[in-house]
């Protein structure tokens, strides 16, 4: 199968990021993740898994029927395509393999993860958990420009290998907000809680769609380059219904029905960090062998029988008037004379950072309280 066809297959299949949104929601709390990173983490591991362990991983990712070589080649092509967006934004994605000193790993595994997943291998002394955690955290912090720190904690001294995946995104708004228009405003967290936020304002031409069936407003706020923020803003009191029903079909339908219109957009500044332990979620999705004594990870090592103990995911996003980096250019936008739509994000909403060319979801999150 050609790489471009395979990539299309991988991107159009249901993904854990949308198919199992209910699994990762945390009521009354912020939720944030990088679906492409935790998906890549198991593609990374699946690179050399065998038998039912591999089958379960691929089934959870929507890759049933694909061979490991096809998935590897598809992901390699995806990384290449994402690389074309890097001039106008800073997008760094990669992986690492922390290996116990003296532990023998199958050479082909290291070659494959380096070639297909841009992965770096390094040795650590897991028999000294605190020192090992510090070294791994330094690796992650360096790769994410110090945005993700202290991710690894409470290491088991019996650990023989840790697979690491990271993504760092720093984008400039295509049309920045004017900081002089930012003002204090109320944000309704829930029926009992209202907080004051720094509310940004901009009037401009945006792609927008108001879904009467799902009682949701969807709009795209573009970054420079090939990346946009998709804002999903349910009507008051409809967030729970949306979270319980949202799927990849909804995202595609909304995207297809977007149209360009004048919009008065009010959006709070926010910064969000979330850490998730994904073992329970993955087990609910059918990935069980990898965590048990029946795990077949013989493609990683022939030395001893090993299993996956935990999968930890951490993601960070900051949003302000300039995006996440100051923009020096001044732009003038020609507006039609018709009255603009008004979108005021003054209650919880969902955000997705989407790479426009591949339709990859780089990050996704639920903003419940912008002040936290």
Curated annotation (Swiss-Prot):
Signal peptide: 1-19
GO terms assigned for molecular function: serine-type endopeptidase inhibitor activity
Residues annotated as glycosylated: 214, 226
Localization: Secreted
Chief place where the protein resides: secreted
Region (RCL): 328-347
Keywords, in A-Z order: Glycoprotein, Protease inhibitor, Secreted, Serine protease inhibitor, Signal
Residues at the site labelled Reactive bond: 337-338
The family this protein is said to belong to: Belongs to the serpin family.
Protein's recorded name: Alpha-1-antitrypsin homolog
Organism of origin: Cyprinus carpio
């Amino acid at each position: 199968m050609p790489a471009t066809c395979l990539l299309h297959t991988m991107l159009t299949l249901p993904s854990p990021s949308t198919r199992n949104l209910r699994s990762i929601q945390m009521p009354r709390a912020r939720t944030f993740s990088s679906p492409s990173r935790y998906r890549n983490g198991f593609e990374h591991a699946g690179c050399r898994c065998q038998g039912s362990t591999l089958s379960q991983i691929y089934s959870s990712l929507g890759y049933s029927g694909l061979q490991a070589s096809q998935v590897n080649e598809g992901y390699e092509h995806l990384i290449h395509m994402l690389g074309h967006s890097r001039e106008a934004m800073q997008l760094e994605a990669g992986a690492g393999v922390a290996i116990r000193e003296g532990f023998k790993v199958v050479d082909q595994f290291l070659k494959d993860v380096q070639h297909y997943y841009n992965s770096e291998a390094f040795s650590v002394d897991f028999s000294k958990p605190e020192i090992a955690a510090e070294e791994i955290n330094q690796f992650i912090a360096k790769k994410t420009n110090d945005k993700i720190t202290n991710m690894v904690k409470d290491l088991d001294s019996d650990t023989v290998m840790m697979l690491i995946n990271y993504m760092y995104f720093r984008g400039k708004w295509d049309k920045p907000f004017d900081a002089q228009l930012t003002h204090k405003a109320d944000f309704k967290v829930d029926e009992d809680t209202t907080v004051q936020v720094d509310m940004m304002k901009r009037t401009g031409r945006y792609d927008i769609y108001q879904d009467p069936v799902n009682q949701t407003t969807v709009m795209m706020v573009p970054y420079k380059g090939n990346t946009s923020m998709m804002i999903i803003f349910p009507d008051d009191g409809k967030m729970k219904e949306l979270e319980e029903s949202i799927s990849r079909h909804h995202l595609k339908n909304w995207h297809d029905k977007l149209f360009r219109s004048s919009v008065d957009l009010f959006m709070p500044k926010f910064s969000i960090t979330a850490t998730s332990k994904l073992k329970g979620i993955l087990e609910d999705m059918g990935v069980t062998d990898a965590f048990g004594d029946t795990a077949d990870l013989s493609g990683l090592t022939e030395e001893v029988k090993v299993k996956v103990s935990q999968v930890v995911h951490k993601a960070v996003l900051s949003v302000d008037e300039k995006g996440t980096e100051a923009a020096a250019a001044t732009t003038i936008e020609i507006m039609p004379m018709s009255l603009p739509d008004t979108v005021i994000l003054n209650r919880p909403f969902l955000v997705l950072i989407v790479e426009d060319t591949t339709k990859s979801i780089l990050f996704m999150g639920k903003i419940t309280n912008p002040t936290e």
